[in-house]
């Protein structure tokens, strides 16, 4: 099992990165809430990973710390939650926000996440409340909404950023029209892909 990778960030294509470790490039899928805190391409990064083996693929899911990975693993234990839905849930809200929703029995907020209907939201609260009751705020490093993300300066690149943002949202489970509408509603000149995704996700919650 691959539990941790320490290498150079070669590519960032939300929600996937390519991390080069000792000459080997690892494709790692990450929740967008983790993606925002990644360093720039070309810099070193440490990612805690969860390794999934399927008949048709071997997949790596990455997180910035062990707490986020632990929550992802708890999600996978819930009935009807696979890696793709777990990734979508933790892209739509931070680990701390999800734990708060479960502990407060706030299924209404969970329903706004892609792939989570009313029954799934209620089941998540029911199944996970006991498992997460001891997860206090001291476990989390608060995510800063003011985190600096480099903007694009070229209009053509900005258009590509919008397309990439839509593609990322679709890969997280949102319908194409919904993703396009969200990106269009928040799009401003010189916005990077990460900023577009972040603001689009916020607009849908």
Swiss-Prot record:
Molecular function via GO: ATP binding; four-way junction DNA binding; four-way junction helicase activity
Q: Does the keyword Nucleotide-binding apply?
A: no
| Domain I: annotated segments | 1-64
Give the main location: cytoplasm
Q: Which domain of life is it from?
A: Bacteria
Region: Flexible linker; residue ranges are 144-156
Q: Supply one GO CC term from the record.
A: cytoplasm
Places the protein is found: Cytoplasm
**Which residue stretches belong to region Domain III?**
157-205
| Region described as Domain II: spans on this chain | 65-143
Any GO BP annotation: DNA recombination
Q: HAMAP family under this entry?
A: DNA_HJ_migration_RuvA (MF_00031)
Per the record, the domain comment is: Has three domains with a flexible linker between the domains II and III and assumes an 'L' shape. Domain III is highly mobile and contacts RuvB.
Question: What does the UniProt function comment say about this protein?
Answer: The RuvA-RuvB-RuvC complex processes Holliday junction (HJ) DNA during genetic recombination and DNA repair, while the RuvA-RuvB complex plays an important role in the rescue of blocked DNA replication forks via replication fork reversal (RFR). RuvA specifically binds to HJ cruciform DNA, conferring on it an open structure. The RuvB hexamer acts as an ATP-dependent pump, pulling dsDNA into and through the RuvAB complex. HJ branch migration allows RuvC to scan DNA until it finds its consensus sequence, where it cleaves and resolves the cruciform DNA.
**Subunit organization:** Homotetramer. Forms an RuvA(8)-RuvB(12)-Holliday junction (HJ) complex. HJ DNA is sandwiched between 2 RuvA tetramers; dsDNA enters through RuvA and exits via RuvB. An RuvB hexamer assembles on each DNA strand where it exits the tetramer. Each RuvB hexamer is contacted by two RuvA subunits (via domain III) on 2 adjacent RuvB subunits; this complex drives branch migration. In the full resolvosome a probable DNA-RuvA(4)-RuvB(12)-RuvC(2) complex forms which resolves the HJ.
Name of the protein in its database record: Holliday junction branch migration complex subunit RuvA
The beginning of the lineage is: Bacteria, Pseudomonadati, Pseudomonadota, Gammaproteobacteria, Alteromonadales
């Amino acid at each position: 099992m691959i539990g941790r990778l320490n290498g150079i960030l070669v590519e960032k294509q939300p929600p996937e990165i390519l991390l080069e470790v000792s000459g080997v490039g690892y494709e790692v899928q990450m929740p967008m809430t983790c993606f925002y805190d990644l360093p720039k391409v070309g810099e070193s990064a440490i990612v805690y990973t969860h390794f999934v083996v399927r008949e048709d693929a071997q997949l790596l899911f990455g997180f910035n710390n062990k707490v986020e990975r632990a929550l992802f693993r708890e999600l996978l234990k819930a009935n009807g939650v696979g890696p793709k839905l777990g990734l979508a849930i933790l892209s739509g809200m931070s680990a701390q926000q999800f734990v708060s929703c479960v502990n407060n029995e706030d299924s209404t907020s969970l329903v706004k996440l892609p792939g989570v209907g009313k029954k799934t939201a209620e089941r998540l609260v029911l199944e996970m409340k006991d498992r997460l009751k001891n997860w206090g705020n001291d476990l989390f490093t608060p995510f800063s909404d003011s985190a600096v993300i480099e903007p694009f300066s070229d209009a053509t690149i900005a258009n590509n950023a919008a397309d990439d943002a839509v593609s990322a949202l679709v890969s997280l489970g949102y319908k194409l029209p919904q993703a396009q509408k969200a990106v269009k509603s928040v799009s401003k000149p010189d916005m990077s892909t990460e900023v577009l995704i972040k603001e689009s996700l916020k607009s849908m919650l």
